[in-house]
Amino acid sequence: MKFSQSLIALAACFLPLIAAAPVEAQHAKIRSPRAQDIIPDSYIVVFNKGVNDADIESEFSSVSRILSKRRSAHKGVGHKYNITGFKGYQIETDTGSIGEIAASPLVAWIEMDGKVQANALETRSGATWGLGRISHKATGSNSYIYDGSAGSGSTVYVLDTGIYIEHSEFEGRAKWGANYISGSPDTDENGHGTHCAGTIAGATYGVASKANLVAVKVLDRDGFGATSATIAGINFVGQNGKDGKSVISMSLRGHYSAAVNSAVESTVSNGVTIVVAAGNDGDDASNYSPASAKNAITVGSVDSTDTRASSSNYGSVVDIFAPGVNVKSASIGGKSAFSIKSGTSMATPHVAGLAAYLIGLGGLSSPAAIASKIASIGTKGSVKDPKGSVNLIAYNGNGA
């Protein structure tokens, strides 16, 4: 399964990388995805599928010897990824060392690490139409019709700028999970993650108002991070999430990355539903990750007239559309503060919340079943200008 004042808003922009020519020349395993920024001397090393723990430990010993031999001043091995079907690590080192590491028979490929950037989003006072839209087949309703289970028993992991967990919208149901931004406090200093979390499970503006929320911080106060940190966040959920009861919401995007897609696809295969933004580039979403990950649920944005937002990415990898223009939700301005934001970043949490809502109803035990249900009950044929995308708007199956 298959985004400035920039383009109205995405949460973030993966900008993976252009490899330096000397590195490419040293080994064909080193990949250089499309990019506009790079993190110098930082790499994501992916092991072959099926590699065992003993071989991995032996490999780390070998890497230590390589770094020691070259007397590298870099930090060395950082994040380690241990998802069934996706194992690897992030390393800071020089080009000579990475060439030696790439030569290992245990290494499938290496990607240069990339920056992640969160764009500023527009805010203003406005209406609350998104919940009305996903609980009715037609536009125009501001009432939200839903089952009282409201996502009870589900947990949504928000990979973003963090969550202001003290906000009244969360009623104590939000907690801190992990922080992959070095030196950053365990709170949301930006506001993007809190807004997304409010749409997912806020008491007033949330789709699944009884679901639990876990903050996984992969973007800093200025909206910057690294591809490697985002994969570390996915790995955290893979290690801590409960199969069939967990959802990842990723309102971020970047140019196509095999490492990001592989981590997403492996985590879904292990029982975690992953909902991702199509992106705000007005472009084919297949050019971006994690939007192009095969078994993620990829979400485009529509406005209150069911017209695809002009900035919303589109195409065959988009699985569904959801409200993403002028969406009201929680903000970091205070425990009762709210703001209005727009973008596929805002559409994505509507569908992540819907996945949690369906888990709360019971009877759906796998990501495939949840995705199938979302597709089968969605409002068909209402999207204006889908531009080659599926013509489907998220719907919870309740209102007329």
Swiss-Prot record:
All copies of domain Peptidase S8, residue ranges: 128-400
Protein's cellular compartments: Secreted
Signal sequence residues: 1-20
Domain spans labelled Inhibitor I9: 42-117
Residues carrying covalently attached carbohydrate according to the record: 82
GO molecular function annotation: serine-type endopeptidase activity
Primary location recorded for the protein, binned into one broad class: secreted
EC numbers: 3.4.21.-
Site feature: Cleavage: 119-120
Pfam families cross-referenced by the UniProt entry: Inhibitor_I9 (PF05922), Peptidase_S8 (PF00082)
Thermal effects: Optimum temperature is 60 degrees Celsius.
UniProt keyword list: Glycoprotein, Hydrolase, Protease, Secreted, Serine protease, Signal
Residues of the propeptide: 21-119
Tree of life domain: Eukaryota
Family matches, as InterPro entries: PCSK9_ProteinaseK-like, Peptidase_S8/S53_dom, Peptidase_S8/S53_dom_sf, Peptidase_S8_Asp-AS, Peptidase_S8_His-AS, Peptidase_S8_Ser-AS, Peptidase_S8_subtilisin-like, Peptidase_S8_subtilisin-rel
Activity at various pH: Optimum pH is 6 to 8.
GO cellular-component term (any): extracellular region
Function field: Major secreted subtilisin-like serine endopeptidase. Mediates the degradation of collagen, the major structural protein in the mammalian host. Degrades the nonhelical regions of collagen that function in the cross-linking of the helical components. May function as virulence factor involved in epidermal wing necrosis observed in white nose syndrome (WNS) in bats.
Similarity comment text for this entry: Belongs to the peptidase S8 family.
Record protein name field: Subtilisin-like protease 1
Upper lineage: Eukaryota, Fungi, Dikarya, Ascomycota, Pezizomycotina
